[in-house]
């Protein structure tokens, strides 16, 4: 399994729509960086957030109550305030179409990690298609700003030695084609 370089990421995005919109260069002046890097792509967080609150005493991933989260539109302010010790969901600006022989792993940006803001995203499986739902945790005792339309995490692409027999699309993955923030789902 090989780690893919900027030239491959660029080719796959421009010729095959792997990342859309695609920024061919790293943008980093006066913003948290995003765009193409040497061996990855820095994704941007959109302006819509879902803040988990304390309306209900329990979070159940098998039976998630949407009333446990409040939608917040940060497009006007350009940032979202994540309360101390709080959790929110967001989504990428970029839409992904993964090749059948490639898996992507997403890692939080050090700019946020050094402020106690942890970003988690599960792997992008072969032939996954959609916007990426991003999990954001504020591990500090202070409120924290998360900047809309700026970098939030880096994606690295790993190409398999051979094509998988069954992709995420082939399995009918429950998050296939997701648009916007997608709450937890259980197949029934």
From Swiss-Prot:
<dbReference type="GO" id="GO:0006226">
    <property type="term" value="P:dUMP biosynthetic process"/>
</dbReference>
<protein>
    <recommendedName>
        <fullName>dCTP deaminase</fullName>
        <ecNumber>3.5.4.13</ecNumber>
    </recommendedName>
</protein>
<dbReference type="Pfam" id="PF22769">
    <property type="entry name" value="DCD"/>
</dbReference>
<comment type="pathway">
    <text>Pyrimidine metabolism; dUMP biosynthesis; dUMP from dCTP (dUTP route): step 1/2.</text>
</comment>
<comment type="function">
    <text>Catalyzes the deamination of dCTP to dUTP.</text>
</comment>
<dbReference type="GO" id="GO:0008829">
    <property type="term" value="F:dCTP deaminase activity"/>
</dbReference>
<dbReference type="GO" id="GO:0006229">
    <property type="term" value="P:dUTP biosynthetic process"/>
</dbReference>
<dbReference type="GO" id="GO:0000166">
    <property type="term" value="F:nucleotide binding"/>
</dbReference>
<feature type="binding site">
    <location>
        <position position="178"/>
    </location>
    <ligand>
        <name>dCTP</name>
    </ligand>
</feature>
<dbReference type="InterPro" id="IPR011962">
    <property type="entry name" value="dCTP_deaminase"/>
</dbReference>
<comment type="subunit">
    <text>Homotrimer.</text>
</comment>
<keyword id="KW-0378">Hydrolase</keyword>
<feature type="binding site">
    <location>
        <position position="154"/>
    </location>
    <ligand>
        <name>dCTP</name>
    </ligand>
</feature>
<keyword id="KW-0546">Nucleotide metabolism</keyword>
<feature type="active site" description="Proton donor/acceptor">
    <location>
        <position position="135"/>
    </location>
</feature>
<feature type="binding site">
    <location>
        <position position="168"/>
    </location>
    <ligand>
        <name>dCTP</name>
    </ligand>
</feature>
<keyword id="KW-0547">Nucleotide-binding</keyword>
<feature type="binding site">
    <location>
        <begin position="109"/>
        <end position="114"/>
    </location>
    <ligand>
        <name>dCTP</name>
    </ligand>
</feature>
<dbReference type="InterPro" id="IPR033704">
    <property type="entry name" value="dUTPase_trimeric"/>
</dbReference>
<dbReference type="InterPro" id="IPR036157">
    <property type="entry name" value="dUTPase-like_sf"/>
</dbReference>
<comment type="similarity">
    <text>Belongs to the dCTP deaminase family.</text>
</comment>
<dbReference type="GO" id="GO:0015949">
    <property type="term" value="P:nucleobase-containing small molecule interconversion"/>
</dbReference>
């Amino acid at each position: 399994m090989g780690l893919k370089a900027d030239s491959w990421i660029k080719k796959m995005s421009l010729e095959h729509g792997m990342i859309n919109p695609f920024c061919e260069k790293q943008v980093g002046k006066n913003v948290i960086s995003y765009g193409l890097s040497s061996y990855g792509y820095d994704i941007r967080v959109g302006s819509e957030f879902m803040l988990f609150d304390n309306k209900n005493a329990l979070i159940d991933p098998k039976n998630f109550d949407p009333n446990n989260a409040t939608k917040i539109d940060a497009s006007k302010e350009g940032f979202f305030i994540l309360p101390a010790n709080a959790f929110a969901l967001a989504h990428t600006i970029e839409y992904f179409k993964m090749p059948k022989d490639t898996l992507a792993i997403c890692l939080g940006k050090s700019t946020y990690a050094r402020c106690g803001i942890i970003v988690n995203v599960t792997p992008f499986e072969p032939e996954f298609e959609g916007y990426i739902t991003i999990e954001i945790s504020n591990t500090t005792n202070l409120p924290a700003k998360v900047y809309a339309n700026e970098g939030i995490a880096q994606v690295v692409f790993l190409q398999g030695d051979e094509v998988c027999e069954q992709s995420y699309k082939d399995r009918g993955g429950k998050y296939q084609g997701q648009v916007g923030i997608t709450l937890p789902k259980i197949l029934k």
